[in-house]
């Protein structure tokens, strides 16, 4: 059975792509009585507030017609930011060599949170080089959340 995030991705991805943006990912989180639906979009050269506003209007229109969410919800549209979330295997492959943090669904060695350098993607296995702990492999389906760690060069 598809998750709400997957259903929404299928529903809106073509529209967002036709507008010239990449739909990086969809997150749904309950906060009190409301559901927050967060869309991450990107494009060459970066995303502006006007881009987010344009996408929000289009997606709101789709949601009004299709009514895919039964709860009250807030829609947020933003750029992926410096701590970019990774949603697909293609995202991981694109950022090999970067530092990241992952949160696992099922703990590995009694840990859910891991931080390290992404060294490779092989099929559905993600490899991280963990400082002072060597390389570890993680099954993509066990990764609940992953974000790049921003690098600031001064």
UniProtKB/Swiss-Prot annotation:
Keywords: Cytoplasm, Ribosome biogenesis. It is found in: Cytoplasm. GO terms for cellular component: cytosol. It comes from the Bacteria. GO terms for biological process: ribosomal small subunit assembly; translation. It holds the Pfam family DUF150_C. InterPro entries: Ribosome_maturation_RimP, RimP_C, RimP_C_sf, RimP_N, RimP_N_sf. Required for maturation of 30S ribosomal subunits. Belongs to the RimP family. This is Ribosome maturation factor RimP.
